[in-house]
Amino acid sequence: TNYPKQFVDLDDDFTLFQKTFNRIQSLSNKFIKIKEVLIVTNEKYRYLVLQQLEKLNNNLKFRLILEPISLNTAPSLTLASFAAVNSNLVVLPSDHYIKNDKILTSSIQKAVRHLDDHCIFLLGTKPKSNQSSYGYITYTGNETIKDVTGFVEKPDSNLAQELISNGNSLWNSGIFILKSKTWLNAISITNKLIYKSIEKSWKKKTTDGLFERPDRKSFSKSSSKSIDYAVIEKAISISLKIKLIELKTKWSDLGEYNSLDSIYRKNNKGNIIQGEVIEKDTFNTTV
């Protein structure tokens, strides 16, 4: 679409993208020093991103890395890792709802304190229903930091219910904490095509003011894989530890409009209303 949901103001406040950026600002404290924010987005959204950033009270340095074509999250994270070599990375999707930023900050701080060169941290949330559109992470242990034992991507409702009943699974929030060199080492082993293509595209990048543009030809040769498929689910085979921390606040991946039901209350007509609206013969609608 020309106007992705993360750039839409859903509640007369800030867009999901703006809320994510503000969330990053709240992360910066005596425990975590934010060096810079890497915004990896598609070339066609560059001015939209700048317009939304201009409306914020921003105190952080940011860089705009523009993907020439849309691939998936593994190439995006590989770009960010080449851009921030020898750094700790907090990977935050810009289209998620998170109710309590303080709880998120606390969870990320725990991960950063225990981070090393051979592990990746995930944040997971307690399943609220047998939702089949989310990924599930299975784990062992009752400690704050848990060991991941497996992944089930978008199970059917019966399997999802079984996972919930077992009591040892969380929804995958898509939030990762890791070292850039850990990712680059892992992706170079599990998917050489992504690593080589993105490495070459980054070396041949051009800079135009605020915009950093990876080379299109090299970038286009990369395969389109998610972070989970490219590395996380193959971690055991490359001696990479995957650790899990529960994010104990309300979270939602707003992938579809019906997912708004999880964060906004419906009125007696089944409508979700934001702003001043006159309802007439309107039912089961988001306005």
Segments predicted by a language model, with ranges:
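A residue-level structural signature of the nucleotidyltransferase/glycosyltransferase Rossmann-like core
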Residues: 89, 175-176, 224, 252
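A conserved hydrophobic position in a structured secondary element of the catalytic/binding core
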Residues: 41, 92, 155, 178, ...
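Conserved core of the sugar-phosphate nucleotidyltransferase
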Residues: 101-221, 239
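Left-handed beta-helix
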Residues: 181-287
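Conserved N-terminal catalytic core of the sugar/cofactor nucleotidyltransferase
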Residues: 9-91, 96-99, 142
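Conserved beta-strand scaffold positions in the cores of enzyme catalytic domains, especially
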Residues: 7, 64, 120-122, 241-244
